[in-house]
Amino acid sequence: MSESEFDGHLQELRRGTIVLASLRLLRTPGYGYGLLEQLASAGFPTDANTLYPLLRRLEKQGYLDSEWNTDEARPRKFYRTSKAGVRLATTLTQEVAAIAAATAALRDEEN
């Protein structure tokens, strides 16, 4: 497997985890750049070119609510996980735990 193929698989796995991490972090309202920093601090480094389209898609799908904050010098769009987003985050969290357990069981079988 070439290095670029390997990196592609890692990127695909990480992209899926960004959805869950974003939904969980945005239970407290936040804006895009702040979320980028939070994701990086939590071990999910993300590119702005990945995050902003994701936020728009999740909003369009009803998993995020948003509003503009114009109180500061520069208007910022704040996002918050919607009720549907909380349900999705709960389901995804359970699924990730099940996948981690299944993966650990496979690892145990190898030994």
Where do the model's predicted regions map?
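Amphipathic alpha-helical dimerization/coiled-coil segments
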Residues: R87-N111
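N-terminal helix-turn-helix DNA-binding core of bacterial DNA-binding proteins
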Residues: L10-Y52
